[in-house]
Amino acid sequence: MKWKYTDYRPEGFECWSAKWKEDYELTVYQIGENRYSIGWYHKGCRVIKDYIDANSWDEAKTLAIARVKNYFHQMATYWDNMELGFIKWTREE
């Protein structure tokens, strides 16, 4: 099974990913009806793995960003001036 990028963004897909400054990536996976797993990676190594409850993908992405900001207070000023463009990943069998 492979993952591929698409920029089509309907609700209910399994993984969204956003890159920041080439070395960082934030992922949001839906693992249940209102349950999401988030990962924060630096150069491909996971720094944070956490779980959040949200009612929609938009809320999950907002909460994921807030969670990362909470872990890295020193990065908050960078995050406030950054736009994350989330990209949906879909599975290919």
Positions of PLM-derived features:
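Short aromatic-glycine-(Arg/Gly/Cys) micro-motifs in beta-strand/loop hairpins
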Residues: 26-48
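Negatively charged, low-complexity tracts enriched in Asp/Glu with abundant Ser/Thr
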Residues: 1-21, 77, 81-90
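Mixed-charge, Lys/Arg-enriched low-complexity segments
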Residues: 42-93
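Alpha-helical interaction segments
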Residues: 4-10, 26, 30-32, 61-62, ...
